[in-house]
Every structure is written in C-alpha cells, then in structure tokens.
Amino acid sequence: MLTLDTLNVMLAVSEEGLIEEMIIALLASPQLAVFFEKFPRLKAAITDDVPRWREALRSRLKDARVPPELTEEVMCYQQSQLLSTPQFIVQLPQILDLLHRLNSPWAEQARQLVDANSTITSALHTLFLQRWRLSLIVQATTLNQQLLEEEREQLLSEVQERMTLSGQLEPILADNNTAAGRLWDMSAGQLKRGDYQLIVKYGEFLNEQPELKRLAEQLGRSREAKSIPRNDAQMETFRTMVREPATVPEQVDGLQQSDDILRLLPPELATLGITELEYEFYRRLVEKQLLTYRLHGESWREKMIERPVVHKDYDEQPRGPFIVCVDTSGSMGGFNEQCAKAFCLALMRIALAENRRCYIMLFSTEIVRYELSGPQGIEQAIRFLSQQFRGGTDLASCFRAIMERLQSREWFDADAVVISDFIAQRLPDDVTSKVKELQRIHQHRFHAVAMSAHGKPGIMRIFDHIWRFDTGMRSRLLRRWRR
C-alpha cells in the first residue's frame, strides 16, 4: 500500500510547511499562553521540546498509509501520464468510470470538462492531467492536515497533562531554569494526580521546617567554602562538641570491681542466695569489691573555645552526585520519617538545579535503591516517599553498599550522606578502615544527618561532617518558638 510520505514526494507536497504551521498553532494556543505567563521558567523547557515534536510528526506522516481509494486513483493518474493523446482518448471512458466509482472529487469536474469539448486535443489532454494533479495535491494536503490535526490534539492533551504536573511541582523542585528543564523532561511518565500529590505534601512539610531545608542547602554547597584566616582577626566564642570517655552501655571492655548491681557477674549474684555468704556479699558491695562487667564508650559534651573570626572565600569546586542512605528502622518512624523524606526531597531539588545525580538507598534488613534525578525521577521519588519505615538497622550493609558504588567510575566524586538516628551496633573494623581509606586516598566525603541527640559517638566519628537536626519534642518546640 502507498505511504503518505511517498505520495508527498510524488506530488511535491511540502509536509515541512504543514508541520511548522501546526507547531506554531500549538504554541500559540491559549492554554500554553496562560501557562507560560504563570511559569516562565518552564517556557524554555517546553520550547526545547519542539525538535522532538517535529521529529515525531515527521515519523507519523512517513509511516501513515494512504486510503485504498486514493492509492488506486494515484496509480491510474500515473498510468495516464504515460499515454499518448490517441491512447488517452481510448482509455478516457474507463478513467471517468474509475473516478466515479472511487468518489473522487475530480470525477464531476472531469466529466464536465470532457462534455464541454467535442474533440479531445493534445492541449485538452494536458489540461485534463494538470487539473487532475491539482485535485490529487488537494487530497494529499487534506490527508496530511487531518493526520496533523489528530496529532495536534493528542500532543496538546499530553502537554496539558505534563503542564499540570510540572506546574504543581515547579515551586517544590525547580530552583532555576536548569531544574525546570529537567523537571519537564521527567514529567513525560504516566502519572496520575493522586501520585504526585505525595511530593506536594512533603514539599509543604519541608516549607514548614525551614531549618531542615537550610541544612540541606548547606550540605549541598559545602564543597565551595574555603576558610582563609587573617593575622589581625578578632576572637569569637565558638561552641563545639567534644568526645570524652564515659561509662555508657556501648561495648563490654572487660571486668572490674565496683558496686554496680545491674552489671554483676553471675557467680557474684549466686553468692547472694547462699545464707553463709550473704553478709560477705553485702560487705563487698559496701566496699565496691564485687566483680562486674566493665563498659567502655564515649559521650559528647559541649565545650566553649575562642578562635579568630574566619573569612570565607567561595572558590567554585566540582560538585559530584549525592549517594544518600536512609535508615528505615522502627526508631526512624513518625516525625523522623517525615524529616528524612523531606530532606531527601530537598537534596533532589539541589541535584536538579545543579545538574547532579541523587541516588537514594534505604537500609534495614535489605537495600532498596531509587535514583531521583533520572528520566523516571518523579516516579522513583513517589515510590520512595510511599515507603514506610518499619525495618531493622543494618548500618554496616549500608556502608558496604555505599563503598561498592563509590568504586564505580561514574560515582568517583560523589558525596555520601547517611540519614539516621545512629542508635545502632558499632561498625565492624573492616568497614571503618575501608571508609577511612576512601576518605584519605580518594577524598570521598561522608556526611551524617543525625536525627537524634542520642546517636552513638563511636559510629559518628568516622564522618567528615555531622549535620544535627534533633527531632525530639523539646527541640521541635524550641524551633517553633524561635520562628
């Protein structure tokens, strides 16, 4: 069967002009005009999509099939061109019958032209073919326009859906023109209104927590600040958290003599049940001579020191992707879960604005992965935000997954971010040593976003930066009061 592209070539019909007219009409439609006025950042993104539309329309016209009636008429026209005038006179009745049978727009005019002239001359033969060709060109142009109109309606419907989605998410995820362009590209997926409303919900929550949003922005630009001390700088008071040894239930270190009843050795406790040794037990208790487990750990305390005022020179450095590990244990549920998800949404916003990648890993008893900056980023973000935090805590597996990804060529300059309350078991020595090796040799940086003030210092000391956001009730009330 004849294709429309072949027909256009045969009749010298310019499909490019028809495509350009259709695209101009689409961009000038009232729906797009209102949208461009409301969201100017997305205007450039949609305009950049025009070449793709043009190519899709060309492909549609190229693959379209010509109706059988028009195909038969074109074949008859081509055969008639090869006839001499005497041969044409002989074939003319069959040609007129064929045009009538095919309901050709040229049929009635052709018969009138023949009836108006008693003799078929060479000039009339040429005129007949010229007008027939014009009729075929009109039919081919009409067919092109019909197909383009169908495509225009379909394209307008698709663009309106994407405009609705992008318009809802633009205030949340698009910080500049780069982010707006990437957001428009990601809006091509099949999403329903109820799906992306989850992103809107967490975006609103993030706006209600400006400290959390500010923390994400500081983490995102932390590579560009370079401190330059001055000899004549004034002194300022600086508060810092320091580690110091403490007896906390973190790790059993050995045995000691004390009066700690809660950590008695079983043999000591057994003497309490023997009447002859009961007084001996109490004597050793008073003298702190009972054998107990010795605990070793570290705690944090606030220390005030004075230091010179530091002036910062912002020297732009290359910024790599984010690899974000999120703790989904039961202790991270509730408000912690909301904060962790909103923080990841803020990092996604930064990644879109700075053309970086944002890779999320959820760790509990297994690792679940999402890439929020890819072509399916919105769908991945919705799946991530739909997850519930009810698992256990396997921080070691999280670090192993991070280190495995950092060894890949495309992630060599990534920043690793771990979001947790850090109430977990101590990390194995092999994991700790590998992290230190990555920090020392490859300059990889590990960030901790601590959602609790009770995180274990033994775990957190391996991080380059610790960003604290206490989600306890007291801290939440203080933040609300300050606002």
Swiss-Prot record:
Q: Where does this protein chiefly localize? A: cytoplasm
Task: Supply the alphabetized keyword list.
Answer: Chaperone, Cytoplasm
Provide the protein's localization: Cytoplasm
Residue runs in coiled coils: none
Query: InterPro entries in the record, alphabetically?
Result: Uncharacterised_CoxE, Uncharacterised_ViaA, VWF_A, vWFA_dom_sf
Q: Which HAMAP family match?
A: ViaA (MF_01626)
Q: What is this protein called?
A: Regulatory protein ViaA
Taxonomy, top ranks, is: Bacteria, Pseudomonadati, Pseudomonadota, Gammaproteobacteria, Enterobacterales
